[in-house]
Amino acid sequence: MNNTDELLAGALAGDLGPRPADLVATSVFWLHHGTRLAGGNTTYLNQYVLVRQGGSFGACAFEPGEVDAAICRDASGASLDTLLREAPRPLRIAALDAYLSAVSPHREAAGAEPVTLPAGTPETRALARDAAIAGLLDIEAGAKVGLIGVVNPLVAAIRKRGGDPLLCDFNLRTTQWGDPVTDDMHEVLDTADAVVATGMTLSNGSFDTVLARCREREVPLVVYAQTGSAVARAFLGAGVTALSAEPFPFSQFSADATTLYRYRAVAAA
């Protein structure tokens, strides 16, 4: 599998599981929320569109203005085939994520390592989540770690692992510690010894660029995904070295213990 277009085509053809034309998106909904963690100076604003199909959910973040709330009315009850072919990209990714999650739920997937995030405050849960993500990095002290999609606790977790973060985000210009953040991901992809990328890159199509560049340079790629966690999983061992998959409901929407799933690509013999 080379890119998300090939994955989408495989799903539509029924090569990956049931025919999407036979499956229905029971519920399509969206979430818009803000978060400012204690001690931070950044308010994170996120929008997600979500698809419920059978026993699974699929999710994709989107930028303001990309998806209108009316889509919840118009798309609920549609076939997955229709959404995968005709919907705006964020909804297509959410539908594909729901489809792949139904075919192979994270809780049942071979190779998935469940990690329990403890009950507690947003800060406690964010620190635990980002430590779990950074724990997927296999790096030497001082390694340059490209981070595409910047959240302050993850920057701190990478540093704790001994990495030197190279930061890229489309909406953030500095961290709470004053680290510069570029909006040009090629500055990061061309120099990093390892890359950590958010699943949100699936929303705007930049995931394929990140994937291809990491393959070309033969550098490890760790994906942390609420957006498209099952979509990113499809590239495990094909450019993605490791994955932290967090299916809906996400950790920020609960104060109780929740589970994310870590995957590592199996090395070739």
Model-flagged regions — what are they?
Residues 189-190, 212-218:
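Short, conserved loop/helix-junction motifs that constitute active-site signature segments
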Residues 220-269:
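C-terminal functional extensions of proteins
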Residues 162-163, 216-220:
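A short helix->loop->beta-strand "cap" motif at the edges of active sites that frequently abuts
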